[in-house]
Amino acid sequence: MVVSMALVRHSPSFDFLFHFPVDRSRFLSPVAFSSVRYHRFHSCRWLSLRSSPSCSRRLNSFSSRCSITNTDVCHEFVTTDDEIHEDLLTPIEDHSIPIVHLDTNISVTESLTLLTECTYVDTVLTALPVLSEEEQTVIAATPAHPEGLYVLYASCLVGNLVEQLWNFAWPSAIAMLYPSLLPVAVMGFVTKLAIIAGGPVVGKFMDYSPRVPTYISLNVIQAAAQVLSAGMIIHAYTVPSTSASSILLQPWFFALLFAGAIDSLCGIASGVAIERDWVVLLAGINRPIALAQANAVLHRIDLLCEIAGTMLFGILLSKYDPVTCLKFAATLMVGSLPTMTALIWLTNKFSSGVLDRPKCSLNSCSAEGSRTNTDSIFDIGMETIKLGWKEYIQQPVLPASLAYVLLYFNIVLTPGSLMTAFLTQRCVNPSVIGGFSGLCAVMGVAATFLSANLVKRVGILKAGAVGLFFQASLLAVAVAVYCSSSLSHKSPLFFFLSMIVLSRLGHMSYGVVGAQILQTGIPSSKANLIGATEISVASLAESLMLGVAIAANDASHFGFLAVLSLLSVVAASLIFCRLLRNPTDEQRRLFSFDPLSN
C-alpha cells in the first residue's frame, strides 16, 4: 500500500468520511487495534493492524484525531488480511519497523508535490470510503476538472475546423490545377513517410516535454507550415502550367512536400497529446464514465468540424477562384492561432494547473537526460523507433490494432484526397463533393451515439465486429455498382456515393469501439509511445496504397484501387474475428466483463 500523506486530525465535520469509531483508550492500551476499510469501486481491502506491546510507545504519540487523505493503492502489492497478520506476528527482532513522523501542519498544496507518475489521479474517489453503487456512478460520471475540459473542447473546435478545412482545400486546389492523381498521391506518400519515421520519436518527445508550452509551439509551427503550403499552391497557379510529372521537379513542389510533412507531424503530436494525455488528466483516469463521455465529445467535435470545414470550402470553391479560396484559408489559419493559444492557457488555469504536472518520475527523467547527453540524436531516434515497434507488436490487443491499421489501406472508398481528386476530374460540382464529405462526417457523428447502445447489447468485441462487417458489406455493393455501370450518369454516381456514406457508419463505429479496446488493453505508461507507433504503422499502410496509386495514377485505374480498398476492409474483419473467436488468456482477463463466449 502506498500512502501519499497522513494527517493526524479529526473533526466532527469529517465524520461522514469515516465509518469506523476511534477509541482513545484502545490506542493507549498495550494492545492497540485499528480497522480501516478501503473502498474504491468494486475492489475492497480490509487491513487489520495489530501491534505488540513493544509498539505501544509509538502509538501513544498518536492523537485520536486521525484521518487519511490522498491514498492510492497499487493493487499488485495489496496483500490479504491473513498475509498481513502473519507478517505482524513475526518477532520484532527479525524485522525492522519504520518510524513514520507525521506533521500536522502540512498543507494540501504541499501534498500535491508528493505526487508521482503513478498517482496522477484526482483524490475525490480515493478520499471517500464506503459509497453506494449509485454514488459511485455519479462520481465516476463527473469530470475531475469540468471547466478545463469544456475549454479544451472549445480549443479543439477551433483547431479542428482549420485543420479539416485545409485537408479538403489543398487536394481540391491541386486537382483543379493538374488533371492527374499523381501530385496528390506523391504529396500524401511523402507526408506518410514522415509520419512513419517520426511518429515514435514525436510520441516520446511529447512524453518528456512540458505540456502547455510544447502544445502551443506545435500549433505555431503547424500554422506556419500550412500558410507556406498555401503560398506554394498559389504560386503554382501563377506560373505556366506544365505536365503533372514535370511539376514533381519544381522547387515550389519540394517546398510543398516539406511543409506538408511538418504539418502532418505537428498534427500527429498534438492529436496524441489531447487524446491520450490531456483528456485523461482533465476527465480523471479513475472516472471511466466521464472519460468515455469526453472521448465521445472529442470524436463528435472532429466530425462536426469535418462537416463544417469541407462544406465551407466547397461552397467557396463553387463561387470563387481557387486562389481566393486559398488566401481565405491562410487568413483563417493565422487568425485562429491567438484564439487557440488563449484557450489552451485557460484550460490549464481552470484545471488548477493539472497540465503542469511532470509526466515522469525523477529517476526516469534523470536517466533519460543522462542518456541524451551521451548518445547522438540519430542513435536516440533509432532506439526510440525500435522500442516503439517492439512495444506495439507485444501489446495484448494487437489483432484489434491490426484491424484498425488495415482500414488505412482503404484510401479511395473514403472521403479523402484521392476521392476528392477523382470526383473533381469527373467534373462533379464542388458543392456536391463537399456535401459528400459532410454526409460522411454526419454518419460518423451518428456512430458515436449508436456504438454505445451496440456495446450494451452485444458487448464491446462483438460491437467492433458488427461495425467492420457492416462497412465491408456496403463497400462491396459500391464496388459492384462502379464495375457494372458508368458513373457518368447521376443515378449510378449518387448510389455509389451513398453506399460509401452509409459505410462510414460502420467505420466510425469500429473507430469508437476500437479506441476503447485499445485504451483497455494498452498500459497507461506506454499509451503515448504505442499510440504514436500505431499511427506510424497506419501511415505505412496508407503510404503503400498511395504508392500503388502513384503507379496507377490515371483516373481509369480507379476501379482497381477500389477493389484493393475493399479487400483491406474484408481482411480487417477477418483478423478481428480471430480476437473474438480465439482470445488468449490475457485478452480474456482484460475483457472479462465482455460476453466473449456468447
From Swiss-Prot:
Transit peptide limits: 1-54
GO biological process, one term: intracellular iron ion homeostasis
GO molecular function, one term: transmembrane transporter activity
UniProt tissue specificity: Widely expressed.
Subcellular location: Membrane; Plastid, Chloroplast envelope
Membrane topology annotation: Multi-pass membrane protein
Record has S-adenosyl-L-methionine as a keyword: no
Induction: Down-regulated by iron deficiency.
Chain ranges passing through the membrane: 182-202, 216-236, 252-272, 297-317, 326-346, 402-422, 432-452, 463-483, 493-513, 530-550, 557-577
InterPro entries: Ferroportin-1, MFS_trans_sf
Highest taxon in the source lineage: Eukaryota
Record has Transcription regulation as a keyword: no
Disruption phenotype: No visible phenotype under normal growth conditions, but plants are resistant to several aminoglycoside antibiotics, such as kanamycin, streptomycin, gentamicin, amikacin, tobramycin and apramycin.
A matching Pfam family: FPN1
GO cellular component: chloroplast; chloroplast envelope; membrane; mitochondrion
Alphabetized UniProt keyword annotations: Chloroplast, Ion transport, Membrane, Plastid, Transit peptide, Transmembrane, Transmembrane helix, Transport
Recorded family membership: Belongs to the ferroportin (FP) (TC 2.A.100) family. SLC40A subfamily.
PANTHER family linked to this entry: SOLUTE CARRIER FAMILY 40 MEMBER, SOLUTE CARRIER FAMILY 40 MEMBER 3, CHLOROPLASTIC
Biological function: Probable plastid transporter that may play a role in iron chelation, storage or sequestration under limiting iron conditions. In presence of exogenous antibiotics, may allow opportunistic entry of multiple aminoglycoside antibiotics into the chloroplast.
Protein's recorded name: Solute carrier family 40 member 3, chloroplastic
Protein source organism: Arabidopsis thaliana (Mouse-ear cress)
Gene for this chain: IREG3
